[in-house]
From Swiss-Prot:
<keyword id="KW-0687">Ribonucleoprotein</keyword>
<dbReference type="GO" id="GO:0019843">
    <property type="term" value="F:rRNA binding"/>
</dbReference>
<dbReference type="GO" id="GO:1990904">
    <property type="term" value="C:ribonucleoprotein complex"/>
</dbReference>
<dbReference type="GO" id="GO:0006412">
    <property type="term" value="P:translation"/>
</dbReference>
<comment type="subunit">
    <text>Part of the 50S ribosomal subunit. Contacts protein L29, and trigger factor when it is bound to the ribosome.</text>
</comment>
<keyword id="KW-0694">RNA-binding</keyword>
<dbReference type="InterPro" id="IPR013025">
    <property type="entry name" value="Ribosomal_uL23-like"/>
</dbReference>
<keyword id="KW-0699">rRNA-binding</keyword>
<comment type="function">
    <text>One of the early assembly proteins it binds 23S rRNA. One of the proteins that surrounds the polypeptide exit tunnel on the outside of the ribosome. Forms the main docking site for trigger factor binding to the ribosome.</text>
</comment>
<dbReference type="InterPro" id="IPR012678">
    <property type="entry name" value="Ribosomal_uL23/eL15/eS24_sf"/>
</dbReference>
<protein>
    <recommendedName>
        <fullName>Large ribosomal subunit protein uL23</fullName>
    </recommendedName>
</protein>
<dbReference type="Pfam" id="PF00276">
    <property type="entry name" value="Ribosomal_L23"/>
</dbReference>
<dbReference type="GO" id="GO:0003735">
    <property type="term" value="F:structural constituent of ribosome"/>
</dbReference>
<keyword id="KW-0689">Ribosomal protein</keyword>
<comment type="similarity">
    <text>Belongs to the universal ribosomal protein uL23 family.</text>
</comment>
<dbReference type="InterPro" id="IPR012677">
    <property type="entry name" value="Nucleotide-bd_a/b_plait_sf"/>
</dbReference>
<dbReference type="GO" id="GO:0005840">
    <property type="term" value="C:ribosome"/>
</dbReference>
Amino acid sequence: MNLQDVILTPIVTEKSQDLETIGANSKKGTRMVKYTVKVHIDANKTLIKEAFKKIFKVTPSSVNVQVYRGKIKRFRNMPAARPHWKKAIVTFRDGASIDFAKEA
């Protein structure tokens, strides 16, 4: 799999924005910043870490992954399945920042 295809989109929610700002404003010794992104369903933790190293030139300290199953929804009175998707929460130490708009 190409490393450019691993990271799909950043997830912008209130909780993900809090993870970015709370870690950056930490008063403890190490500042940890967490970014939440939607990744390819076949990507694993090491592939996600390599993609961040290559694309953003920043090495993550840890990667947490969650898989969401697609829901069954109705479309024109017929059941249709939404696709499964994967979310990664990537942690950086020492307050490393990423600008997703610049790298797009």
